[in-house]
């Protein structure tokens, strides 16, 4: 077994525990799926005890570290909610009152903005990879990425979304429409794979258009306000996209 297997188990232990802490937000089907994930993760932990002995509590603690920090509560957002128009309908974008976790607090993600050859850091391009349609942003390495996992009782599936937050401008630079996936554990593993793939995010044509619309309205300050980024003061807020009315 590899170290990746151990890390994966620890991540699943942390996520399952955190989701069950919000049991009141889970419908019966989702709660059963998370409980099943917790049970299977504990079984993996026992299997790994021969080469990586640790307690369930240790696995949760390490999983939290791998997830990059304590879960933060999004409070009193300082940025104005926006909306974008698609096919005659307005999609409101609000700051969700749910928990978020900052991702990617390492030097490459905290470096200054790097424009592409045209001097445009907001460009997004689409391409296909292994059957999935992906959006890849052209280099702005100061983006603060976040991931949000929340149950959707109406569809009994897991929704997840990504937000790009520019530390230079203190503004949201882009986001992805929450995607629906069948199965809690499958969905969370997809989230982890997206995180590991850098600034490549699973999306579709509508998501790309909205992403470009948000980015086109953003302003870029190409210089740092401080010589050294202050990670502790970096704030990340999650956007949720409500379904448009009929």
Curated annotation (Swiss-Prot):
GO terms for biological process: symbiont-mediated suppression of host cytoplasmic pattern recognition receptor signaling pathway via inhibition of RIG-I activity; symbiont-mediated suppression of host type I interferon-mediated signaling pathway. Pfam families: Flu_C_NS1, Flu_C_NS2. One of its GO terms (molecular function) is RNA binding. Its main location: host cell. It is found in: Host cytoplasm; Host nucleus. Transmembrane segments: none annotated. GO terms for cellular component: host cell cytoplasm; host cell nucleus. Keywords: Host cytoplasm, Host nucleus, Host-virus interaction, Inhibition of host innate immune response by virus, Inhibition of host interferon signaling pathway by virus, Inhibition of host RIG-I by virus, Inhibition of host RLR pathway by virus, Interferon antiviral system evasion, RNA-binding, Viral immunoevasion. Prevents the establishment of the cellular antiviral state initiated by host RIGI, which normally triggers the antiviral transduction signal that leads to the activation of type I IFN genes by transcription factors IRF3 and IRF7. Also participates in the up-regulation of the splicing of viral mRNAs. Belongs to the influenza C viruses NS1 family. This is Non-structural protein 1. The gene is NS.
């Amino acid at each position: 077994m590899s170290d990746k297997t151990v890390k994966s188990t620890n991540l699943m232990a942390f996520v399952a525990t955190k989701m069950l802490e919000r049991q009141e937000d889970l419908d019966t089907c989702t709660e059963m799926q998370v409980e099943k994930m917790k049970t299977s993760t504990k079984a993996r932990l026992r299997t790994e005890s021969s080469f990586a002995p640790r307690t369930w509590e240790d696995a949760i603690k390490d999983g939290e570290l791998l997830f990059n920090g304590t879960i933060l509560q999004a409070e009193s957002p300082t940025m104005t909610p926006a909306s974008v128009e698609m096919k005659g309908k307005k999609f409101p974008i609000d700051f969700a009152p749910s928990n978020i976790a900052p991702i990617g607090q390492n030097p490459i993600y905290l470096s200054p903005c790097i424009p592409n050859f045209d001097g445009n850091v907001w460009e997004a391009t689409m391409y296909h990879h292994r059957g999935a349609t992906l959006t890849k942003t052209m280099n702005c390495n100061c983006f603060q990425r976040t991931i949000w996992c929340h149950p959707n009782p109406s569809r009994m599936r897991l929704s997840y979304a990504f937000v790009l937050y520019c530390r230079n401008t203190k503004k949201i630079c882009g986001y992805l429409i929450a995607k629906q996936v069948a199965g809690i554990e499958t969905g969370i593993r997809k989230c982890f794979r997206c995180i590991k793939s850098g600034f490549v995010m699973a999306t579709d044509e509508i998501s790309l258009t909205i992403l470009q619309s948000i980015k086109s309205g953003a302003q870029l300050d190409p210089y740092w306000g401080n010589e050294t980024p202050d990670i502790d003061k970096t704030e990340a807020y999650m956007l949720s996209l409500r379904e448009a009315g009929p």
